[in-house]
A protein has these predicted regions:
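Sec-dependent signal peptide recognition
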Residues: 1-7
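Bacterial Sec-dependent N-terminal signal peptides
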Residues: 10-35
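Catalytic-core regions of glycoside hydrolase
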Residues: 28-68, 79, 115, 192-202, ...
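Aromatic-lined substrate-binding rim segments of carbohydrate-active enzymes
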Residues: 72-152, 215-233
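Conserved, mostly hydrophobic/aromatic
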Residues: 83, 180, 193, 226, ...
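Active-site groove signature of glycoside hydrolases
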Residues: 148-212
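Catalytic cores of secreted or luminal carbohydrate-active enzymes
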Residues: 316-371
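Extracellular/luminal regions of secreted and cell-surface proteins that mediate adhesion/ECM remodeling
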Residues: 358-494
């Protein structure tokens, strides 16, 4: 019914706003009016699990906090939404129980620098030292008797790495993850965490075992370890790793509510099978995207020249293809990455940076509302509302650890600016608002208990785990806002 009504109203009130009506006119109830809302597309709109990310990608030395934020300050404030820490376990816990968030002053400054700039945190903590400047696993694990092997580090170094199924390694890592979750299972400051990080670079490849028959068992152990400790943060894993997507889906996605990440965008490493999985999983799980090529932005270093699928001639070509993959396959995030890559993106492809600021991830808002402007005390009235997502991705409200916590709501504020009452539309589901689709809803609200007087209607997407306070920025143009609520119309109760 509402789709027909809304189509009628959009036709009759095109180009107008706050259109009044008489009883039944144009299908709008007596005492109600149609309100046409415009999206604010003026710039950065931060929301959880979306947008550009800045990195400390510590295959070399970890970043110096003061130098890092001096270089990344502008990008952090103008473009980015999250700060991704990809560190060795040996940096996060160099000695048993000596955690970086307690004892490492540089680490604490890096984290605080992100939070001070309004960025959420994201993490991958890995144990394998391949291509690293130093060992990925703390030395105390080997000293405790864990068995391992050597991988190739930087400068031809041989770096010890534990077998993934070694019981001592597993015991020590479980202890670390429990402490890690105690500090960071907090959606107020953390967006997502990589809940599988074995193998080279933490991407699930070239994993070695004491018993190769334990691959699936070890994968289950690792993902269980993270999922039992992190109850409030979305967990993701690199998909199509060597264990195979069927196992990833069965154990991590279906059983434990994991999302996906792909670290090979803009390259031959993003395969047709990767594309197929991304298409199949869009709207079902969060998908985190990352460019394959990094480490430079000038002709002095061009690792993409060996790409057998794309004939890249410059870093700008790489940026174009990476952006296209993120847009086409609906990845919620993309990486400005470290200082070097940020210079490349912002210097060579500023138009792509801005496009992803405006359209990366999700950007949702109510396009149209039909609601009362007057009613009698105690009356039950209806509110009809239509929502649109102009982003490439989606709002992953259906992820297990979010558990549908975000919902559209309308509220009445009195003349002093105090919130009197709010009503959540439980049937309106933001995770269903896929790219450039509209979803329409109608629900009834009771004005029982609200005194006669003048009020203002406001709209928000609230977080049910935070006492129904606004939790998602919706960006409506030319409307007054207060504490995350956007005022859209006046209301009189007689």
């Amino acid at each position: 019914y509402f789709q027909i009504l809304l189509a009628c109203c959009l036709t009759l009130f095109a180009g107008c706003s706050d259109s009044d009506s008489e009883s039944g006119q144009n299908g709008i109830p007596k005492g109600s009016k149609a309100i046409d809302l415009q999206q604010d597309r003026s710039g950065l709109l931060r929301n959880p699990c979306m947008g550009w990310g800045l990195y400390d990608d510590a295959v070399g030395n970890v970043a110096n906090a003061e130098e890092y934020w001096a270089a990344q300050d502008e990008a952090a404030r103008n473009y980015a939404s999250f700060f991704y820490i990809r560190w060795r376990w040996s940096e996060m816990e160099p000695e048993e129980g000596k955690y970086a968030w307690i004892y490492d002053e540089n680490y604490k400054k890096l984290i605080q620098g992100a939070l001070d700039r309004g960025l959420k945190l994201c993490f991958r903590i890995y144990d394998n030292g391949q291509d690293n400047i130093r060992q990925g696993t703390p030395e105390y694990v080997r000293a405790a008797g864990a068995q391992g092997y050597e991988v190739e580090g930087q400068n031809n170094a041989k770096l010890w790495t534990p077998y993934a199924d070694d019981p001592i390694f597993q015991q020590k890592y479980e202890k670390f993850v429990a402490a890690f979750a105690k500090e960071y299972d907090n959606p107020d400051i953390v967006d997502f965490i990589d809940g599988h990080s074995l193998g080279w670079w933490g991407e699930g490849s070239h994993i070695k075992y004491l018993n190769s028959d334990k691959k699936k068992e070890t994968f289950d152990w690792f993902t269980t370890m993270y999922s039992k400790n992190f109850k409030n943060i979305i967990l993701v894993l690199p998909y199509n790793s060597e264990i195979g997507f069927n196992t990833e889906k069965e154990i991590a996605i279906d059983q434990k509510g994991y999302g996906l990440r792909r670290d090979g965008l803009g390259s031959m490493w993003f395969t047709e099978n990767d594309e197929k999985v991304a298409n199949e999983m869009y709207g079902k799980v969060l998908m985190v995207g990352e460019c394959a090529y990094w480490g430079g932005y000038t002709a002095a270093y061009e690792p993409f020249k060996n790409d057998t699928k794309y004939s890249f001639k410059s870093w700008k070509d790489v940026y174009n293809q990476s952006f296209d993959h993120a847009q086409t396959y609906h990845f919620n995030t993309l990486d400005l990455r470290t200082i070097t890559e940020t210079k490349g993106w912002t210097g060579l492809a500023p138009e792509l940076v801005r496009k992803f600021v405006l359209n990366g991830g999700y950007r949702v808002y109510p396009t149209y509302v039909i609601m009362p402007y007057e009613a009698s005390a105690g009356q039950t009235v209806s509110i009809s509302h239509s929502w649109r997502n102009t982003g490439y991705g989606y709002l992953p409200n259906n992820m297990k650890n979010w558990n549908y916590k975000y919902k559209p709501a309308f509220a009445l504020f009195d003349e002093s600016g105090k919130l009197v009452k709010s009503w959540i539309d439980e049937d309106a589901e933001p995770s269903q608002w896929l790219s450039n689709q509209r979803k329409n809803y109608t629900y009834e609200v009771s004005l029982d208990g609200i005194s006669r007087g003048n009020y203002q209607w406001a709209v928000a997407i609230v977080d049910k785990t935070k006492d129904n306070q606004p939790g998602i920025n919706i960006g409506i143009k030319d409307k007054e806002k207060k504490d995350g609520w956007t005022f859209i119309s006046e209301m009189t109760i007689k």
